[in-house]
């Protein structure tokens, strides 16, 4: 199932890239533009994503936790920095920074029950542009758990109080993205949880997500 998710995610990403490549290249500078200059782009806009949430099996329990759907919606603030030269007009070592505020829900299956964890996510990611539009990104995502439903999880005669799962997590996030010239971005990201759900519930979260965002330029 996870392989199918990955195939679908990559198909969506490259479909967006194929469409975007028909547009004008945003990194081509006119001949009369001043080169050898450091510049900064700032963009802000909405972001929406979906994918698969996964969790490791907790120690001392056999809940047979399985992955299920996850989604997130929110806003993103993006900074792009580059140093252009007359030798390489497309730029040398493009760097960027992305800060997001997302409301998300991660769902997990255990037998006939579905557990939903709703949370606030704050990713802070360093970005490196490997071409004019393609970039790699990596960083940390701070997660604040808002609520869990249902409060109890039961399977095989074992009942666990999951409403007491702690409210904070830190996830390592890495992915790739394609930015178009007209503001639409397509991305794939993997998040791996570094914290356990609770002292007596040793399970960690992860998620594979595809997303679409649209950036309005504040500074070009």
Predicted regions and their residues:
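Short glycine/proline- and aromatic-enriched beta-strand/turn motifs that initiate or cap beta-hairpins
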Residues: 21-85, 193, 215-220
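Outer-membrane beta-barrel architecture
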Residues: 74-78, 123-125, 175-177, 211-213
């Amino acid at each position: 199932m996870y392989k199918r998710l990955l195939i679908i995610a990559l198909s969506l990403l490259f479909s967006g890239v194929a469409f975007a490549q028909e547009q004008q290249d945003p990194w081509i500078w006119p001949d009369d533009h001043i080169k050898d200059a450091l510049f900064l782009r700032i963009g802000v806009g909405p972001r929406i994503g979906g994918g698969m949430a996964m969790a490791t099996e907790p120690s001392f329990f056999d809940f047979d936790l399985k992955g299920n759907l996850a989604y997130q919606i929110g806003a993103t603030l993006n900074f792009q920095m580059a140093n252009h030269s007359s030798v390489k007009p497309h730029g040398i070592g493009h760097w960027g920074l992305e800060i997001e505020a997302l409301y998300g829900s991660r769902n997990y299956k255990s037998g006939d029950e579905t557990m939903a964890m709703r949370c606030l996510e704050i990713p802070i990611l360093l970005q490196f542009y490997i071409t004019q539009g393609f970039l790699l990104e990596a960083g940390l995502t701070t997660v604040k758990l808002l609520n869990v439903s249902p409060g109890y999880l039961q399977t095989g005669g074992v009942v666990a109080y999951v409403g007491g799962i702690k409210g904070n997590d830190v996830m390592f996030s890495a992915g790739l993205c394609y930015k178009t010239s007209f503001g639409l971005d397509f991305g794939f990201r993997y998040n791996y949880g570094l914290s356990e759900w609770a002292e007596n519930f040793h399970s960690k979260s992860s998620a594979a997500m595809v997303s679409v965002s649209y950036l309005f330029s504040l500074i070009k």
